[in-house]
Amino acid sequence: MSGRFAFNKGLKEVRFLFCQTGEHSAATRSFLLRNYPAMKKDNPATPILIRDASGTLPKVYARFEFGKEKSQSLEGLSDQQIEETVSSLVKNNS
């Protein structure tokens, strides 16, 4: 499990947006409950922001050096698909 979420060195911040009660965000909430401790342990210096607001569609943002930002919708994805999406997003800054 260690290193599964080893972030790219150019990554400055990861942000998760989702609804705290909506069914469309259930997989995102489950993913974060299960994986946040491992992500933070593997990347203690990188801020991982969790923003929940009523009615918000699930999405993840990755901010890289020089202000470059990428985002990916997590709507309709399973817990496993979210893990793959986040892993891919935080390892690529191209």
From Swiss-Prot:
Highest taxon above the source species: Eukaryota
Keyword Transport: yes
Membrane topology: Peripheral membrane protein
Primary location group: mitochondrion
Disulfide links within the chain: none
Database matches in SMART domains: L51_S25_CI-B8
Gene Ontology, cellular component aspect: mitochondrial inner membrane; respiratory chain complex I
Alphabetized SUPFAM superfamilies for the sequence: Thioredoxin-like (SSF52833)
Entry's localization field: Mitochondrion inner membrane
Keywords, ordered alphabetically: Electron transport, Membrane, Mitochondrion, Mitochondrion inner membrane, Respiratory chain, Transport
A Pfam family the protein falls into: L51_S25_CI-B8
InterPro entries xref list: NADH_Ub_cplx-1_asu_su-2, Ribosomal_mL43/mS25/NADH_DH, Thioredoxin-like_sf
Coiled-coil intervals: none
UniProt entry tagged with the keyword Iron-sulfur: no
Function: Accessory subunit of the mitochondrial membrane respiratory chain NADH dehydrogenase (Complex I), that is believed not to be involved in catalysis. Complex I functions in the transfer of electrons from NADH to the respiratory chain. The immediate electron acceptor for the enzyme is believed to be ubiquinone.
Similarity comment: Belongs to the complex I NDUFA2 subunit family.
Assembly mode: Complex I is composed of about 40 different subunits.
Name of the protein described by the UniProt record: NADH-ubiquinone oxidoreductase 10.5 kDa subunit
Organism, as annotated: Neurospora crassa (strain ATCC 24698 / 74-OR23-1A / CBS 708.71 / DSM 1257 / FGSC 987)
